[in-house]
A protein has these predicted regions:
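Interfacial segments of multi-pass membrane proteins
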Residues: 48-49, 60-67
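Alpha-helical transmembrane segments and their helix-entry boundary regions
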Residues: 41-45, 53-57, 75, 103
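Alpha-helical transmembrane segments
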Residues: 1-10, 50-58, 107-111
């Protein structure tokens, strides 16, 4: 229920560029920052794991795709972002990079470049009637606004999840002791670093 309400209310519309969708005579879509949209799946990612987070991300993507982006890739995009976020905050590797990714704020902000890449990919394949250069121009012209909107959502969700993870640290991220990261277990990496 929270995912439905969060995905549909409290949004800010950013107008992107004057470029419409290639081949369609319509107003440029822009990007919408739905402030609470990522909050349900980030909290589910920390408390319940990747499958629950992906389910809520897919539900959020379905609602956003229908009401906002009008793009099927939104469903897959947000489901994948939710699953990756859950994997980041629930992994138990001990190196500094993985310790940073265990923090919800860092994990959520690290998803922004990946989301932009997925947007460029989906915008490129969303309209097949236009030429390759028109589709690439449209995708790259709107990537900045997409990054701004998704970055705002992830900043808010990451801050809330950071507070929740500090307040309920026993329930957040699963149980288990820290283990060596893949780089620490690699004989090649250990040989090169001299340990």
């Amino acid at each position: 229920v929270a995912s439905v309400a969060a995905s549909l209310f409290f949004g800010l519309k950013f107008t992107a560029s004057p470029l419409p969708v290639p081949g369609l005579p319509e107003e440029p879509p822009g990007s919408t920052l739905m402030l609470f949209s990522a909050l349900p799946w980030t909290l589910a990612g920390g408390w319940l794991g990747p499958i629950a987070a992906a389910g809520l991300g897919i539900l959020s993507g379905l609602l956003r795709g229908f009401w906002d982006t009008h793009n099927f890739f939104t469903l897959l995009d947000l489901g994948l972002m939710a699953a990756i976020f859950a994997v980041f905050v629930r992994q138990k590797y001990r190196t500094p990079l993985f310790q940073l990714l265990r923090q919800p704020l860092a994990a959520s902000l690290s998803l922004v470049p990946l989301h932009v890449l997925l947007f460029i990919f989906s915008a490129f394949f969303a309209v097949s009637s236009a030429s390759v250069t028109e589709r690439l121009d449209y995708a790259f012209s709107n990537a900045g606004m997409v990054a701004l909107a998704f970055g705002g959502e992830m900043l808010f969700a990451g801050l809330v999840a950071q507070v929740v993870s500090a307040a309920f640290s026993a329930q957040w991220g699963g149980l288990g002791s820290l283990q060596p990261s893949p780089a620490e277990r690699s004989i090649e990496t250990r040989f090169v670093s001299g340990t």
